[in-house]
């Protein structure tokens, strides 16, 4: 573990319920969903992690508890360090609290979590789909999403897709 990161990890372990995994010089800190906003605020305000450089999820289907890990990658430019926070989330009704009050950049990334993985973000200011058209069923980055499906029609590709569709002939 990076020497600059050790006191930060130790402070998180003392104050929050965490577990740590290290793999190839990367440190992953596991945080409970109900603690993530407090941890993000602490890291931003006390330890200069001013940049939320990534926010995504990983699906561990068919495992259900936890099925997902929501992954926050934070960077401190002043300290030249990066840390990954992982929030395990169950598969039945996946929910996490919004981080938009801590990092504005979380807005669209959290909408992507809802759209692509079906992870509900509680308290989000604009919980609309961001990538898929309204009315799309399912969440394409889930491992149980069917691979053979009809391509969604957007305004720019309606004619192109229409030409490929088989229509009933009389």
Task: Set out the residue ranges of the language-model regions.
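Terminal low-complexity/charged segments
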Residues: 1-170
């Amino acid at each position: 573990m990076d020497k600059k990161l050790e006191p930060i990890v130790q402070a998180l372990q003392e104050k929050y319920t965490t577990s740590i995994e290290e793999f190839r010089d990367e440190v992953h800190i596991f945080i409970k969903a109900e603690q993530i906003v407090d941890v993000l605020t602490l890291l931003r305000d006390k330890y200069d992690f001013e940049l939320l450089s990534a926010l995504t999820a990983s699906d561990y289907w068919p495992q259900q508890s936890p099925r997902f890990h929501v992954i926050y990658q934070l960077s401190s430019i002043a300290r030249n360090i990066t840390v990954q926070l992982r929030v395990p989330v169950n598969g039945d009704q996946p929910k996490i609290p919004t981080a938009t009050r801590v990092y504005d950049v979380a807005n669209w990334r959290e909408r992507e979590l809802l759209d692509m993985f079906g992870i509900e973000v509680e308290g989000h200011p604009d919980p609309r789909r961001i990538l898929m058209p309204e009315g799309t069923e399912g969440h394409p980055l889930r491992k149980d999403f069917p691979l053979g499906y009809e391509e969604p029609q957007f305004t720019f590709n309606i004619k192109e897709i229409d030409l490929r569709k088989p229509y009933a002939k009389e």
